[in-house]
A protein has these predicted regions:
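Core catalytic region of metal-dependent phosphoesterases/phosphodiesterases
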Residues: 6-7, 11-124
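Acidic, His/Gly-enriched loop-helix segments that form or flank divalent-metal centers
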Residues: 100-173
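Short, flexible coil/linker segments at or flanking structured domains
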Residues: 2, 27, 86, 131, ...
Length: 173
């Protein structure tokens, strides 16, 4: 029976490797039960802590490859639970840390395709479409990682609506 609605799922700000594994397990169970037709991973799947400009805990010794491996395993699990879903990955501000790190520390490597997020996280193999500019319009709704933050409840949504002229779904805030 054909329905006149679409099952869409939004998941923002997992921040691997600092993810909450219990919350992620609940999310996986929900994906399996809900069977969404479209999934938006709304940025900041990676934290990129190892390459951030912030002071690092020397006892942590977290490696960037560990962050990537954790994020790929999350994506693989999502894909395994729903092989038919269209999956979009919206760029977040933490993914932008990769490019900034290269610009500041290894300009000569900044143009390598192998170091682009879609290759580091194996989007092609997993059938994930990358939204590089961090925002897309999907069936009349803006979907983005977002950066607008306001002090009072509801003001962020109002500011986003005024900026974009339509309803939307934002992460980050």
């Amino acid at each position: 029976m054909k329905t006149n609605y679409e099952k869409v799922l939004f998941i923002p700000d997992i921040h691997c490797p600092f993810q909450d594994d219990k919350a992620l397990e609940v999310f996986y169970q929900f994906v399996q039960w809900f069977k969404p037709e479209t999934i938006f991973i709304m940025g900041d799947l990676l934290d990129c802590y190892a390459i951030s400009r912030f002071t690092k805990d020397p006892n942590g010794a977290l490696k960037f490859q560990e962050e990537l491996d954790t994020a790929v395993s999350v994506l693989e699990r999502i894909r395994h639970l729903n092989k038919k879903a269209k999956i979009y990955y919206i760029r977040g501000n933490h993914e932008a840390r990769i490019q900034k790190f290269l610009w500041n520390n290894a300009k000569e490597l900044s143009g390598l395709h192998a170091l682009e997020i879609e290759n580091l996280l194996d989007f092609k193999r997993l059938g994930i479409e990358y939204v590089k500019d961090g925002m897309m319009k999907y069936k009349g709704i803006i979907v983005k990682h977002g950066s607008v933050v306001r002090k009072y409840a509801g003001y962020t949504a109002k500011a986003e609506f005024e900026k974009n002229g339509c309803s939307g779904v934002s992460a980050h805030t």
